[in-house]
Amino acid sequence: MAILCTTTSPAEKEHEPKQDLEKDQTSPLIFNPSLLNLQSQIPNQFIWPDEEKPSIDIPELNVPFIDLSSQDSTLEAPRVIAEACTKHGFFLVVNHGVSESLIADAHRLMESFFDMPLAGKQKAQRKPGESCGYASSFTGRFSTKLPWKETLSFQFSNDNSGSRTVQDYFSDTLGQEFEQFGKVYQDYCEAMSSLSLKIMELLGLSLGVNRDYFRGFFEENDSIMRLNHYPPCQTPDLTLGTGPHCDPSSLTILHQDHVNGLQVFVDNQWQSIRPNPKAFVVNIGDTFMALSNGIFKSCLHRAVVNRESARKSMAFFLCPKKDKVVKPPSDILEKMKTRKYPDFTWSMFLEFTQKHYRADVNTLDSFSNWVITNNNPI
């Protein structure tokens, strides 16, 4: 996805088109923070190229706040969102209606999970080619530029069937003793899905289409929830918690803990977004960029680590139903006349990023070329 910063992005020099990522397993390595931190130097697999290593001092990004409780939100918010999303795709939402106690419980259980011994976490080990499960620095999937993190990802389906996919995942994968985890994260994902639909109404108004259009498009969704843990690192200037990338999904809703780490590439420089416990960080993903025909930007971002404190965050990736055809609404196409991206389904894009391509600044463009070149049927 190379729309916002194609010529100056540090990630562009290392993007890996048309590579079978499942075969990149030449130097398997176990990421165990408690053991790695006893070493004076981090393994070479975690050291990033000089041009991609984190900067010491960077400015703070001026991110607009969207107050969802304000009666004027449907009047002023679309203009503010449009301004942010045509430039970098990031904004904050406050007074969002999500229970503070639910957020606190989700953070508490996330900390409890990552504090478990490695063997316990590996019961949920992600399988090759899949997007969900426990992943320790993507070891086994990649062999270079490994991120200094561990994650737990799981699917959420909002299909009006009353299914409890998240709750079932924890019980089936980790055992009945994780029933409370399943209940909390099921409720959290449902809250994130509802919040996403509210934001979709504002995005529709921002783009000049019916406010119900995108809400209806995502009413049923096959989304992904991810818990992120970035342990302290003895040499944080050599590595990254998450490398530069654009999210392939449609919309990301992120809640950070109190530790700085999120950085966005805007105006040819990295800028940070300060943690705010009262706010969710929202950003546009590649799929919604395609839905807007390139009007709204999916922006390059990354996560850095530090020597003193662990950082944790929770990311909800809103995605359409896997068989839903992604194409801009007619209102947008009538104004722009030309299509920037081919029709595709989320299942096609997800497979591309899991099996053929390591997400970076060029993901959407590379995927579009892949679809056209291979004449992939929808």
Curated annotation (Swiss-Prot):
Q: Where is the composition biased (Basic and acidic residues)?
A: 11-25
- What is the induction comment? Negatively controlled by the level of physiologically active gibberellin. Up-regulated by auxin, paclobutrazol, long day exposure and cold treatment.
Q: Which PROSITE patterns match?
A: FE2OG_OXY
Query: What does the note under cofactor report?
Result: Binds 1 Fe(2+) ion per subunit.
What function does this protein fulfil? GA53 is less effectively oxidized than GA12 and is only oxidized one step to GA44. Involved in the promotion of the floral transition, fertility and silique elongation, but plays only a minor role in elongation of seedling organs. Acts redundantly with GA20OX1.
- From the UniProt record, give the pathway where this protein acts: Plant hormone biosynthesis; gibberellin biosynthesis
- Pfam families registered for this protein in UniProt: 2OG-FeII_Oxy (PF03171), DIOX_N (PF14226)
Q: Which GO terms describe its biological process?
A: gibberellin biosynthetic process; response to gibberellin; response to red or far red light
Higher taxonomy: Eukaryota, Viridiplantae, Streptophyta, Embryophyta, Tracheophyta
State the family it belongs to: Belongs to the iron/ascorbate-dependent oxidoreductase family. GA20OX subfamily.
Q: Where does the record place the Fe2OG dioxygenase domain?
A: 220-320
> Which amino acid positions bind Fe cation, per UniProt?
245, 247, 301
The protein's Enzyme Commission number: 1.14.11.-
* Protein name as annotated: Gibberellin 20 oxidase 2
Entry annotated with the keyword Transmembrane helix: no
Task: Enumerate the cofactors the protein uses.
Answer: Fe(2+); L-ascorbate
- Source species, please? Arabidopsis thaliana (Mouse-ear cress)
Q: What happens when the gene is disrupted?
A: Slightly smaller than the wild type.
In this UniProt entry, which cysteines form S-S bonds?
Answer: none
Active site per UniProt: 311
Q: Which residues form a coiled coil?
A: none
